[in-house]
Amino acid sequence: MVASSINEESSLAVNLTSDVEKASKTLFKAFEKSYANDYLMKKFFHIPITEKVSRARINAMIHYYTTCYHDLDGEIAEANDFDAVAIWSRPGCHLPATLSDDESFNKIFFSRLDCEEARSHASGNGLLLPLCHRKRS
């Protein structure tokens, strides 16, 4: 697979990989100073926002999700010897939605999606459909 710029002057080989360790290390660097990612990891792992969490623990959470995508038939791609990494789920191979303990967060992050509209626009790809298919209580 090759990713090309809009003007086609340069291109970069993008390779599918199963090297979860190297992919995780790239993501550790990418999200090292991302407070937004730290916030989401805490929410998804049911950790209070005020609790101190080490970088090693956040990295373990990133590694866990990377491994889950790999194990559940998601795809991991890398470019330029792991200078960049992308992870996605293929249609029908989505991770289960992970609700947090915070109802207001769940309403914003999950429930406010208009699932009927998502179905009409999504053609079975991406994150919206598995969220729509989960049972609501």
From Swiss-Prot:
Highest taxon above the source species: Eukaryota
InterPro entries reported for this sequence: N-acetyltrans/Recomb-assoc
Name listed for the protein in its UniProt record: Uncharacterized protein YOR012W
Organism of derivation: Saccharomyces cerevisiae (strain ATCC 204508 / S288c) (Baker's yeast)
